Curated annotation (Swiss-Prot):
Residues 219-429 form the Peptidase M12B domain. GO terms for cellular component: extracellular matrix; extracellular region. This is A disintegrin and metalloproteinase with thrombospondin motifs 8. The active site is at residue 364. Zn(2+) binds at residues 363, 367, 373. Keywords: Cleavage on pair of basic residues, Disulfide bond, Extracellular matrix, Glycoprotein, Heparin-binding, Hydrolase, Metal-binding, Metalloprotease, Protease, Repeat, Secreted, Signal, Zinc, Zymogen. Residues 173-183 have a biased composition (Basic and acidic residues). It comes from Homo sapiens. Residues 138-210 are annotated as: Disordered. Transmembrane segments: none annotated. Residues 690-831 are annotated as: Spacer. It is found in: Secreted, Extracellular space, Extracellular matrix. It is an enzyme of class 3 (hydrolase). InterPro entries: ADAM_Cys-rich (IPR006586), ADAMTS/ADAMTS-like (IPR013273), ADAMTS_ADAMTS-like (IPR050439), ADAMTS_CR_2 (IPR041645), ADAMTS_CR_3 (IPR045371), ADAMTS_spacer1 (IPR010294), MetalloPept_cat_dom_sf (IPR024079), Pept_M12B_ADAM-TS8 (IPR013277).
């Protein structure tokens, strides 16, 4: 665990923070909260010695002389702001910035300190006689001769220090269509557009190799910000400041404790596209623009997560208007869901509309972090209606500042991180661009007329006759045309925080408040864990369930950007570990059977019977409920998580807990060291059984008995090795019950692919006939006797290579002689005529909606060669329609 950085003494910390300031021109280096007095001043240049710059300020009844020298020592080598110009090559913008920064003293006092930027006016801060002062330009130009606001903050240290990253470390969504244009007498109209490949997202869960589970850890979302040519043309020299301000607003939203995690947005690189031919292809098709941008941004990312320029997600900002269904052009952003650690898909596209784009950015980044819309079926099923005032509301109306994140958003994010799908966020960046921390409405970039131009276009400005109730709460804008109607958007379009709204008053969260109240220092409070809650309900009534206890980060709750709690947020223990009464069904099988009553039918209208599917399931998906139609290859994922306490697989004792495989013993206790011995006895010493092994002697054509394995046998392993260079040597394993029913490769129908064989709750795993080592395995006690056979097809002679082993309880009467005697009575005669030989059905060609399944149907003669003498009228079908789950609209 990396320790949190110790707090250094004031002077070096102030120097570092204030030197970072000019990247966000006009923003104070520390939160603008609590200024005591301010005056407008015009800096004047004084003669200075060689290599020194002297500036004079007059305010508060006295003069200030700043003697400054160049100082860019705080800029890390990794610092990157790049531009794509006419050459198509990225050129660094930091070289010019390095000449912006100066530090020095005030009025010759050795204990004073000044740190400022001289690019685009004078921005920065200084300390003198125990008081702190900040200065920033009030105009849009870059001259020193323009008015600047000098603000006095009282004793140094009276304002809260900015919160840096927490270094302490303890793992196709739809487009967002939030706003529609309105005239003042129009009704609010909006529709939600689904992007390409959109679907209702399942909770992002799966098994993981991480050892830490249900732990709150600091996460760092390393971000590439890209502004296209339309942004560069619209904002000009203010572009960098604008996009960093958007990110600053979004970062504050992600610091709110309602997100239930420690999320830090970090900008590692800004890329400004000055020539559109070198940028991503942007059009009014939001989905297509996203695909183009995702492909384009990959060239700038470093593959190693440890590289200082590596980023976890890329965001494109554009002035392009996106149009969707029925020609509606009110889509504001688009992103794929749950792609945060996928370098090919972790990206989003944002339509810039001034400061409002910060909320769109936060929303689309939420999709990338796996959050669905608040009105999606999974959210409403779990939490009910959640209103329209959270970040992930499908339509942006007004953000609930006290609870910006819905419980559903917090849950999906937590499951993404606890499931190990956000491990790329665990590393803190080596260097990140500082974000503005002041009130944006204080800057010339966001004066009222500028806010109107950014949202509606260059010909708009603020309506002068705004009603008293709309001051700060609703931005109305108009043009100077023949009919100067006032326009607005959404149910709520508040003025930028910090916008002057009257003498001595500023806007704050849609209200006009006294300036001293808006800028009053807000104490920063780190969060603390509340006591552990009671143990919850056990997930099972027998066989080893799991119960949870949780604790919340609300003692105290983080306030004003304070750190969210780090450490374990949930703990679990085993419960009801007694064995279940034997019923011949596994717990996973019972979960699949629940869907037998649903309207899933075959071509003849018969209800399908569902059994667990293990074969072909990736290790990370073992805790999803995969079920296969009995006797068919069709399968479905019915649940994103099996019930806690379900075995991860037939060959392991590990159990699923919240979608993750965790270690457990044969006594059904989590983290227990107890294991099954070779006899299948929990904690046994392996002395209650004996080993049986053997091999097959030369056989006749047809089905030949190898061995009949008695009930109670464990650790069964039957192997048939193909001859080198021969894919089909004419020998295949088969399996049948005591009453003669075939479970595997019977009636000359060979299973080429891996499959599971379910026998009264016990699974036998079959490798498939195409495997070089054809294998049949089972690890748990066999519930009934089974006969293993070898099918030998006439043709080129390849002697079989079959070996088998298993363990039989000492009290079971079994001898190899009796097995061999039985084997001699079950020899099948050679095939006498050509027959149709069937392969297994393929998977459905479509993951949703209608598709097709295919299989091989071949006519083979008694020698196994292709033949044309089979009865074509009796040829089985080789294709059939299949239907997976309905495709989302």
């Amino acid at each position: 665990m990396l320790p949190a950085p110790a707090a250094p003494r004031w002077p070096p910390l102030l120097l570092l923070l204030l030197l970072l300031l000019p990247l966000a021109r006009g923003a104070p280096a520390r939160p603008a909260a609590g200024g005591q007095a301010s005056e407008l001043v015009v800096p004047t240049r004084l003669p200075g010695s060689a290599g020194e710059l002297a500036l004079h300020l007059s305010a508060f009844g006295k003069g200030f002389v700043l003697r400054l020298a160049p100082d860019d020592s705080f800029l890390a080598p990794e610092f990157k702001i790049e531009r794509l110009g006419g050459s198509g090559r990225a050129t660094g913008g930091e070289r010019g910035l390095r000449g912006c920064f100066f530090s020095g003293t005030v009025n010759g006092e050795p204990e004073s300190l000044a740190a400022v930027s001289l690019c685009r006016g004078l921005s920065g801060s200084f300390l003198l006689d125990g008081e702190e002062f900040t200065i920033q330009p009030q105009g849009a130009g870059g001259s020193l001769a323009q008015p600047h606001r000098l603000q006095r903050w009282g004793p140094a240290g009276a304002r809260p220090l900015p919160r840096g990253p927490e270094w302490e470390v303890e793992t196709g969504e739809g487009q967002r269509q939030e706003r529609g244009d309105h005239q003042e007498d129009s009704e609010e109209e909006s529709q939600e557009e689904e992007a390409e490949g959109a679907s209702e997202p399942p909770p992002p869960l799966g098994a993981t190799s991480r050892t830490k589970r249900f732990v709150s850890e600091a996460r760092f979302v390393e971000t590439l910000l890209v502004a296209d040519a339309s942004m560069a043309a619209f904002y000009g020299a203010d572009l960098q400041n604008h996009i960093l301000t958007l990110m600053s607003v979004a970062a504050r939203i992600y610091k709110h404790p309602s997100i239930k995690n420690s999320i830090n947005l970090m900008v590692v690189k800004v890329l400004i596209v000055e020539d559109e031919k070198w940028g991503p292809e942007v059009s009014d098709n939001g989905g297509l623009t996203l695909r183009n941008f995702c492909n384009w941004q990959r060239r700038f990312n470093q593959p190693s997560d440890r590289h200082p320029e590596h980023y976890d997600t890329a965001i494109l900002l554009t002035r392009q208007n996106f149009c969707g269904q029925e020609g509606l052009c009110d889509t504001l952003g688009v992103a794929d869901i749950g792609t945060i650690c996928d370098p090919n898909k972790s990206c989003s596209v944002i339509e810039d509309e001034g400061l409002q784009a910060a909320h769109t950015l936060a929303h689309e980044l939420g999709h990338v972090l796996s959050m669905p819309h608040d009105d999606s079926k999974p959210c409403t099923r779990l939490f009910g209606p959640m209103g329209k005032h959270h970040v992930m509301a499908p339509l942006f109306v007004h953000l609930n500042q006290t609870l910006p994140w819905s419980p559903c958003s917090a849950m999906y994010l937590t499951e993404l991180l606890d499931g190990g799908h956000g491990d790329c966020l665990l590393d803190a960046p080596a260097a990140a661009l500082p974000l503005p921390t002041g009130l944006p409405g204080r800057m010339a970039l966001y004066q009222l007329d500028q806010q109107c131009r950014q949202i509606f276009g260059p010909d708009f400005r603020h309506c002068p006759n705004t009603s008293a109730q709309d001051v700060c709460a609703q931005l109305w804008c108009h043009t100077d045309g023949a009919e100067p109607l006032c326009h607005t958007k959404n149910g709520s379009l508040p003025w930028a925080d910090g916008t002057p709204c009257g003498p001595g008053h500023l806007c704050s969260e849609g209200s006009c408040l006294p300036e001293e109240e808006v800028e009053r220092p807000k104490p920063v409070a780190d969060g603390g864990w509340a006591p552990w809650g009671p143990w919850g309900e056990c997930s099972r009534t027998c066989g080893g369930g799991v119960q949870f206890s949780h604790r919340e980060c609300k003692d105290p709750e983080p306030q004003n950007g304070g750190r969210y709690c780090l450490g374990r947020r949930a703990k679990y223990q085993s419960c009801h570990t007694e064995e279940c009464p034997p019923d011949g069904k596994s717990f996973r099988e019972q979960q699949c059977e629940k869907y037998n009553a649903y309207n899933y039918t075959d071509m003849d209208g018969n209800l399908l019977q569902w059994v667990p599917k293990y074969a072909g399931v990736s290790p990370r998906d073992r805790c999803k409920l995969f079920c296969r139609a009995r006797g068919r290859s069709e399968f479905k994922v019915f649940e994103a998580k099996v019930i806690d306490g379900t075995l991860c697989g037939p060959e392991t004792l590990a159990i699923c807990v919240r979608g993750q495989c965790v270690k457990a013993g044969c006594d059904h206790v989590v983290d227990s060291p107890r294991k099954l011995d070779k006899c299948g006895v929990c904690g046994g010493k392996g002395n209650s059984c004996r080993k049986v092994s053997g091999s097959l002697t030369p056989t006749n054509y047809g089905y030949n008995d190898i061995v009949t394995i008695p009930a109670g046998a464990t650790n069964i392993d039957v192997k048939q090795r193909s001859h080198p260079g021969v894919q089909n040597d004419g020998n295949y394993l088969a399996l049948k019950t005591a009453d003669g029913q075939y479970l595997l490769n019977g009636n000359l129908a060979i299973s080429a692919i891996e499959q599971d064989i379910l026998v009264k709750g016990t699974i036998l795993k079959y490798s498939g006939s195409i495997a070089t080592l054809e294998r049949l395995q089972s690890f748990r006690p066999l519930p009934e006797p089974l006969t293993v056979q070898l099918l030998t097809v006439p043709g080129e002679v390849f002697p079989p290579k079959v070996k088998y082993t298993f363990f039989v309880p000492n009290d079971v009467d079994f001898s190899m002689q009796s097995s061999k005697e039985r084997a001699t009575t079950n020899i099948i005669q050679p095939l006498l005529h050509a027959q149709w030989v069937l392969g297994d059905w393929s998977e459905c060609s479509s993951t949703c909606g209608a598709g097709w399944q295919r299989r091989t149907v071949e006519c083979r003669d008694p020698s196994g060669q292709a033949s044309a003498t089979c009865n074509k009228a009796l040829k089985p079908e080789d294709a059939k329609p299949c239907e997976s789950q309905l495709c989302p609209l």
